[in-house]
UniProtKB/Swiss-Prot annotation:
This is Zinc transporter ZIP13. GO terms for cellular component: cytoplasmic vesicle membrane; endoplasmic reticulum membrane; Golgi membrane; perinuclear region of cytoplasm. Keywords: Cytoplasmic vesicle, Endoplasmic reticulum, Golgi apparatus, Ion transport, Membrane, Transmembrane, Transmembrane helix, Transport, Zinc, Zinc transport. It comes from Bos taurus (Bovine). Residues 1-15, 90-108, 171-235, 300-368, 423 are lumenal.
Length: 423
């Protein structure tokens, strides 16, 4: 017809219009879906931020703030035990080490320190690591054996680490010159060299050589003490997370254990060349390790919903009844009955209905406890057997050798008594 468009052109136009409409629809849908995805992502981020703020708010809540204060104060008290040797060792000890009486007294203190180090390793650190491995093992005897072998490897790793550190800062020539340097008092020189007088005086080494080589073992001992105090901070904080009573008992137990150990460490620092006040100040500086351990233990519990995690160190310090796997009556309520009254409900009943087991420790704390105890044991073994024992073996006088052996046994007996009656 004359007024109608061509049928072919009409079909092509309709197809173009249809395709254009379809493209616009797809573009609009894609834009809408992208906007929806963007809005969902913003909402998820907001939820994560709110959860993060809630977790950190719980970390700094009133009840947890009290745990923070008690844990940090307890760790600080353990660190302040480093000043106890100032009350035991006479004031003139630091200035009379080059006299005959001072050198002999230092060897007596070193004998006690050697016994304390060996007792600390074999009666305290390694048994705790062994007990933790057995309690954490759930894969049968084969897995338990592998974990115990890993403990041995960590002990060797700690020993070798301290060996490498001393090699890095050790000058054998300087030490040889230092060991043969003449003393102003010949009797003191004889006491320090196993009762033998030096036949010929050697050249006096420079002050830098003496300072650099004498103090290597002292710095290694400070490093080992810092790591050991880190584990003490873990124990104190984890115990306060259980209850204030358990936290106080744990703090007192660690304090009683640390006092004889600090006396031995003080003697090692004096042997390394530190004066009395410098040794005391450096002993106090190791308290920073305890504070870091306490902060690590508390922060590992709350943020991002990690869990309770108090079983790691609190169990090692006697928070659970020995041999039964059941919480002590004093802490049963907190472990299994939920929040206290006024904090969300929950009654203190035992056993709960249904029973609620204690949740597994957080991975970070678990991995830390798994290696830090045997690693510290290896470091203490290196200090005892490489830095302290050779000085005692140089003694030739039978009576003084007997005194040193008796003092060594006394150091071990003290650790045995604290392990039996305190922990």
């Amino acid at each position: 017809m004359p007024g109608c468009p061509c049928p072919g052109i009409g079909m092509a136009g309709q197809r173009l219009l249809f395709l254009a409409a379809l493209a616009l629809e797809l573009l609009g849908g894609a834009g809408g879906s992208q906007q929806a995805l963007r809005s969902r992502g913003v909402a998820a981020a907001c939820r994560l931020d709110s959860k993060e703020s809630e977790s950190w708010g719980a970390l700094l809540s009133g009840e947890r703030l009290e745990t923070w204060i008690c844990s940090l104060l307890g760790s600080l008290m353990v660190g302040l035990s480093g000043v106890f040797p100032l009350l035991v060792i006479p004031l003139e000890m630091g200035t009379t080490l080059r006299s005959e009486a001072g050198a002999r007294r230092l060897k007596q203190l070193l004998s006690f320190a050697l016994g304390g180090l060996l007792g600390n390793v074999f009666l305290h650190l390694l048994p705790e690591a062994w007990a933790y491995t057995n309690s954490a093992s759930s894969g049968g005897e084969r897995q338990s054996l592998q974990q115990q072998q890993q403990l041995g490897l960590w002990v060797i790793a700690g020993f070798l680490t301290f060996l490498v550190l001393e090699k890095l800062f050790f000058d054998s020539k300087g030490k040889e010159e230092t060991s043969q340097a003449p003393s102003k008092d010949p009797a003191a020189a004889a006491a320090l060299n196993g009762g033998h007088y030096l036949a010929q005086p050697a050249a006096e080494p420079g002050p830098s050589a003496v300072v650099r080589n004498i103090k290597v073992s002292g710095y290694l001992n400070l490093l080992a003490n810092t790591i050991d105090n880190f584990t003490h901070g873990l124990a104190v904080a984890a115990s306060f997370l259980v209850s204030k009573k358990i936290g106080l008992l744990t703090t007192m137990a660690i304090l009683l254990h640390e006092i004889p150990h600090e006396v031995g460490d003080f003697a090692i620092l004096l042997r390394a060349g530190f004066d009395r006040w410098s040794a005391a100040k450096l002993q106090l500086s190791t308290a920073l390790g305890g504070l870091l351990g306490a902060c690590f233990a508390i922060c590992a519990q709350s943020p991002k919903g990690v869990g309770t995690g108090v079983g790691v160190v609190a169990v090692r310090r006697g928070a659970l009844a020995e041999g039964h796997g059941r919480p002590d009556p004093g802490i049963r309520a907190r472990l299994c009955s939920g929040p206290p009254r006024g904090m969300g409900g929950g009654r203190y009943t035992w056993p709960p209905s249904p029973p609620q087991p204690v949740r597994a420790p957080p991975p970070a704390t678990e991995e830390t406890v798994a290696w830090i105890l045997p690693f510290t044991s290896g470091g203490f073994l290196y200090i005892a057997l490489v830095n302290v024992l050779p000085d005692l073996l140089e003694e030739d006088d039978p009576w003084r050798s007997l005194q040193q052996v008796l003092l060594l046994c006394a150091g071990i007996v003290v650790m045995v008594l604290f392990s039996v009656f305190v922990e």
